[in-house]
Amino acid sequence: MYNHQNKNFILKKYSHLINKKFSSFGMKKYPRREEIGGDYCLFKYLYIPGIKAYNLGDYIQTIATRSLIELIDKNAKFHFYNRDSFSLYNKKESICIMQGWFADDYNFLPNERIFPVYIGTHFTKKMQEYFDVLNVDFKDFEIGCRDLSTLDYFNKKGANAYFSRCLTLTLPKREVSAKQNSIFLVNLNHEMSSLLPDFIKKEAIEINQKAIKIKNRNLKNEWQECYKEAQDILEKYASEAKLVITTALHCAAPCIALGIPVILLQEDKVYEDRFSALKGILKPYTFNDLKDNRIDFEPKILDIEFLKEMMIKNLKLTLKKHMFTLNKDEEKELNSIRNKIAHFE
């Protein structure tokens, strides 16, 4: 939590930036799509030099966002920019779907050249405290929240907040194949793995998608290798998996979308809210469930095709709303769609 000294320090250091940094939060009028040429900015991630492993979940979100945009805008053009330095963005004016986790500091805030659409967004407690210190007014702010804690925070702030879930749930369902006969354990710790039934352990292949090692270290282009690794891991799940057991949200959600049976294990209480993106879809098991043999190791494929349809329509109509081209009937439809997304089960 911020103490009194920290609050004064932040206000002194950043108060002159408040208007500029938060100018893109509200429902400012975006150019029509034709005026920005159908340009969309997607997130890439520049990790701290010296770190030798990377979380593919970041790029799985980028892949899902791109896939969804391509469904609703056949003429979309894409470029990539570092998520954590949007305040410095200096490229062509573009729309950015703000699907993701924010953030370690204020530099993620889009400047006037980015037209942010907040769908699938999570704000950390640190950023919520930062907003509180700066007393940000969110009355004109619309946000589609990835999780329930972000939703609760912005509802209390008087924002137009709704539960959008995570866009990784919109990936297209795979074709069924006889080659889909592998069991993947994704980011399970040793204690969890040791408690699995013998028939699972005998067949299982362990994967760590949160710590992928980059083969060719090149700070300028390494994000492209990460992106390709994320594409490859999704293809591996789609073409080979008969069951995925994981502790990772951005493994569970895309695998559910692909039509793979999933078992989600919750490492601790911290993950309970993180997994609220899957509320009504898949309930996570706890460590005690695993220890006490309360897990169904033959889960069914979950049918979320209706939810995908609603999430696709939500993005399409939300873009129209931000461009002020939404008519009254579409406004009613959008509200109905968001309600269906929030209460899907």
Q: What spans do the regions from the language model cover?
A:
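Active-site anion-handling motifs in enzyme catalytic cores
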Residues: 2-345
